[in-house]
Amino acid sequence: MIFHQPEAPADFAGVEAVLLDAFHQSQKAAQDGEPIVYVLRQRDLLGQDTVLGAILASALLSAVRTLAAEKNVANAVAVGDDPAHAEHWIAILHDQSDVTGELIRLGPGHIGKALT
């Protein structure tokens, strides 16, 4: 199962709706023994965009780590402004079973950035 974080919702109800969708998809994937990959927006994960986007990205990363702790194969990819290698890493994380609970950051957006 591959879940792509959408653009930041307009309100908290939108955040709740996205998280509920991610929960249901992840629950089914976990029950079926399918690997889970969340594709996150790097700027949101770093808190460099909207508050609601940051809440959403952080909650999804927490879900990945919880799923992994519960013995599921679950990982995340944080995609920056250039998604050039995203599909490659998504496929790697989805098609393997040795790595779980990890976050792969793509692009240099997180290096040397001060939170603003």
Where does each model-flagged region fall?
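C-terminal substrate-recognition "lid" of short-chain dehydrogenase/reductases
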Residues: P83-T116
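Rossmann-like short-chain dehydrogenase/reductase
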Residues: M1-A84, H88-Q96
